[in-house]
Amino acid sequence: MLQAIYNETKDLMQKSIQALNRDFSTLRSAKVSVNILDHIKVDYYGTPTALNQVGSVMSLDATTLQISPWEKNLLKEIERSIQEANIGVNPNNDGETIKLFFPPMTTEQRKLIAKDAKAMGEKAKVAVRNTRQDANNKVKKLEKDKEISEDESKKAQEQIQKITDEAIKKIDESVKNKEDAILKV
């Protein structure tokens, strides 16, 4: 019964870490990633569709992305969606593909993006702490219902704290690695 609480807690905390890493993939670092376009939706015959579902997106070099739509009539719609997304670039439509030329980041931009990464890390830590609180509440309820002793409850809460500390450590490492990647010139 306690093991089930531990396993559920670990799973939920792991999901918070995975969500953080997904969020990090949308942040720009020294090299532009195709993931920066993940949140962009294109109007595909009246349905908002992910950009990578209507064409191939590839990185040509550290500052250039190319989008090759599977249907050429989508070029204008893709171009409009990118402009509306306000990601800091103007799409260059050559009639076959759309190229996005990202300017090199200034030191100030790098600091702002690093600050965003830190904020994302804090949000993930809050999610982990909320998971810890939920797990501790379950343990306290078991103790209150006399299903476990007070000693077992204390040990369980200590175990939950260890799981939480591990998750927080992983989040801190992820944030530090992302900040280093962003601030690296």
UniProtKB/Swiss-Prot annotation:
Keyword Protein biosynthesis on entry: yes
Gene3D superfamilies: 3.30.1360.40, Ribosome-recycling factor
Any Pfam family matching the protein: RRF
A GO BP entry: cytoplasmic translational termination
Gene Ontology cellular-component terms listed: cytosol
Domain of life of the organism encoding this protein: Bacteria
The entry's keywords: Cytoplasm, Protein biosynthesis
Annotated compartments: Cytoplasm
Keyword Protein biosynthesis in annotation: yes
Annotated region (Disordered), positions in chain: 128-158
Database matches in SUPFAM superfamilies: Ribosome recycling factor, RRF
MF-aspect GO terms: ribosomal large subunit binding
Family that this chain belongs to: Belongs to the RRF family.
Task performed by this protein: Responsible for the release of ribosomes from messenger RNA at the termination of protein biosynthesis. May increase the efficiency of translation by recycling ribosomes from one round of translation to another.
NCBIfam families cross-referenced by the UniProt entry: frr
Protein known as: Ribosome-recycling factor
Organism of origin: Helicobacter pylori (strain J99 / ATCC 700824)
